Amino acid sequence: LLIEKEIWPRDKICGDAVGGKSLSHVKELGVLDMIESTPHYVVDSIVFGSANGSEVRVMLPKESYEKMGLQSGYSLPRMQFDYMMFKRGQEIVRENGGSVIQGFSVNEITVEKTEKGHKITGITGNIGGKRSGNENMTFTSALTIGAGGYNCPVSRVITEIHNEPHRDDDHFCGGYREYWDNVEGLGGEEGPIEIHFIDEVLPGYFWLFPVQGNRVNVGIGMLISEHRKLKADRKKSLKKIQKWVINEHPRFKKRFANATLVSGSEKGWQLPFGSPRKNSPSPFQPRRAAMAGAVCVGDAASLVDPFSGEGIGNALLSAKLTASHFDKDLHKDGFTEEAAIEYMNNLWGALGSELTNSKTLQKVMKWKLLTNWFVKKASKKEEIGKMMSEMIASKESQKILWSPWFLMKTLLLP
């Protein structure tokens, strides 16, 4: 049974970039051909900009990526991408004798006490929400999978039962997005996406991601804890900060002079990062995401990359991992606590290294002087650009950045 709160197609607030890691899972699900038959933007490079005005364009060469079994990535509205994924998801569910319910609000997670503790056995809710007056329905299952985003009711119950925190503002990011048409220097069917670390947005970043035609996803992301630390003269909403950047910033106001805001596209949201928690009461990283009877995937398991902000790839990986840990015969009386622990350990085993590396990169980008210096150096030294391309393609390559020999050879030497 697939239960969905919204009626599809629906908007999803996001940066709209779909990286190569995500596309490999999309291809496996049989959706890639569908995406490629619809309008989309091919990402061939990433432009990184620093506060002092330096920029470096890191190429994502298609041929090199294909040799590694990867794709450089696409950018397209999540309403479009998600609808195709949901369409395929419905087909798979129905082909296997299941059902799909849209517009269903989960009001309660059903929990039973057991000899070993607690077990989630299902959900209760109704179509249209509590105020609709519609009759409540209860569904039970050997396994309940929570995929409801940063505030997923399944993930909240899992952490509450174990008396562990669900939210940590040091690992939650606020995001704000708008769509603009005709931003200077961007558009077409293929080209760069842009990420800028500028004074007015640090310790967050400002992005420009073309999606199709002349339309561009424009947004800001910043850790919620860092946003709260801003001094009074800078403590504005992300919406107001973005408005200033677009209208007043010397590097961007000319680019937006003839651009048009798409009415109704101004929306904010939150991203639960998968960065490791220090001194956490939970024995699992980044937080507890499963228990007897239930697992969480994607944002509900707090798996968003803390540097890039991308969550699709890790969401799809966690969903695939969930399927491999559930055995309908072995778990016919309920998904066990032992299986839940194995899932969480294997999940962190698969993602922990890259999420930890990304957290380190996120922290480095807070240091304005270092970011200015690095981007300026990279813009003049081809070797650094090639290294950054490899880092984007392979998270394992990020480890090279922290090698003392690499720092001396690549950055310090002329």
Residue ranges with predicted function:
Residues E226-R228, A232-H325, H331:
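FAD/FMN-dependent oxidoreductases across multiple families
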Residues D11-G53:
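N-terminal FAD cofactor-binding segment of flavoenzymes
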